[in-house]
Amino acid sequence: MRSNIFVLLLALCSTSVWAQKSNRPDSYNYTRGIEAIQNNNADEALEYLNKEIQEHPDNGYAYSYLSLLRLYREEYGQALTAANVATKKIPSKDKEYVSFAYATRAKVNLCLEDTLKAFKDYTAAINATPDDTRLYEARAQIYYEQSKYDLANADYRKIISLDEGDVMGYMGIGRNANAQKRWDEAISQFDYVIKLASEYSSGYSFRAESYIGKKQYDKAVDDVITALSIDGDNKAFYLMQQLADSAFVLTNNKLKVQTAKEPNESSWPYFIGVVNERQNKYQYAIDAYKNSLSKDNNPITAYRIANCYDDLGNYESALAYCEQAISLDSTDTDYIFQKANILNNAGRSKEAIECMNIYLEKNPEEGSGYYRRGWFKDHSGDIDGAIEDYTMCITLMPEYAYCYLNRGVLYRLKGETKLAEEDFHQVIERDTIADEIECAHYAYYYMGNKDKAVSLINNLIEKDGKSNYYDAACLYSIMGEKEKSIGYLRKALETGFRRFAHIKRDRDLNNIRNEKGYTDLLNEFEEKHRQEVSSDSSDSESFEETTEEIPFSKEGDMCKVKCAINGLPLHFIFDTGSSNVSLSSVEATFMVKNGYLSASDVVGKQHFLTASG
């Protein structure tokens, strides 16, 4: 919601609200407030509009914009208060602004999860401006989320009657048909959308969903690729991964064909990497990601390579690519989080703790950071420190069952039985969804219900053995069934589990640690792993640091550097006699909007006088 106030405004009101009618306000503060909104400056707009309502408390128009601004800032209470005043004070004859006020309040009520009031407000807005198609679309969305497809379709058909060339009516009816698995009806709607707007990616991505429903994967892949080629459609990206599960060879090969068609485009090899990584074909994914990275030095691609190497157990390469991601975008703390995890997987827990400290300094409210640091501290022998971090995680993420389990295990080790049992009860209370059980089997065993624990782990293995073999090895080791534990550990290693440092210090496996079968098994797969890692000789260096010479010309005390932005022949001019290197607000705004600067690049702002004053 925070990206652009002006976009939010356009989504809520007709362009006719901008028209200057004789009976609409034209006071100084009101006018400046509207200009600030158009320039996407929320703080300045609030300042002027608050002054306006102090001077003119009956200006309902100002309240309507204040409601919009508070909505943009996610200050829903103040947004609702302002919207309530706006609906009362805007002249009833000014239908456009009456509609705007109700539509804004409807959006606020949706954010407050009061769909009944939101529905009433959208209906009031429609009564004021019955030809505004966006209002029907917004109300139809509420019906859709309530599975009231007939009522939603009525609003979508109204959109079509108002504007036959607007794709949203047909898209809505098609989406509703998909939700009801009426695939052929949906396809007919999306076919027409594509005829109306052949470059509208959603027509293809939603039709792909219909084809997947009919198991016509060949057509689905074609539509996904078309949608991705238009604008990198998010739904198409999600469906591509779904197709990787249902029709991997077909999806992978068609992406390869697209790569051959557009050899200079970085996205296609990236997508190949995604589908291969999803299928745990990590080396193929790495090769594809590297191809993409060679065309576009993107931190996300380097991050994905790091993840693949981490899953392969090649921690040196994983760290190298994670460092590359950090060097390309030091503002994304997810890369720091991942680096800490890789360090811990490599057995370097103390370094992992230091790295996670950096992450938590930047994200002090992120519960997952405390959970992982607690995990690292446990591995390094700091039980009390681990309990402290798990407790902080529980404070921030009280529904996360694993935190209670790990803390309960540590309390149990310390002999604090009552506290341990309380935590195990919390695990069972939270980890209850049958198809999504994560750790309740451990809690049941610790609480004395072995049969329930075995039943749960067997169900998990039946559903997805590869993801649960290691858990089974841990559970059976805890229960003292050594042969079963070693057998499941073998299955985990055979299906790609390579976290040897974790295996060697996981206390759950202590009961099999001295067994010959365990020792032989680890020796066998560590040797196999060394061969796997050495076979990838291309990774001695993941990236190379170079120094480039930038030509410039000097004119007096000024230096000019030639550059081009969006094809425009420009110069950056630096005054070498100045203590500050600065950009004007116009230049900075231009560069932010075009992706050359982010908010974190701006240190501050300052007013300067030119020589002319």
Regions found by a protein language model. Name each.
Residues 529-569, 580, 597-613:
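Pepsin-like aspartyl protease folds
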Residues 65, 97-100, 104, 138, ...:
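Canonical tetratricopeptide repeat
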Residues 55, 89-93, 128, 162, ...:
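Structural marker of alpha-solenoid helical repeat scaffolds
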Residues 25-27, 60-61, 94-100, 133-134, ...:
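Helix-start (N-cap) detector for alpha-helical repeat units in TPR-like alpha-solenoids
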Residues 217, 221, 225, 238, ...:
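Alpha-helical protein-protein interaction modules
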Residues 37, 71, 103, 107-110, ...:
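Position-specific recognition of the canonical hydrophobic site in helix A of tetratricopeptide repeat
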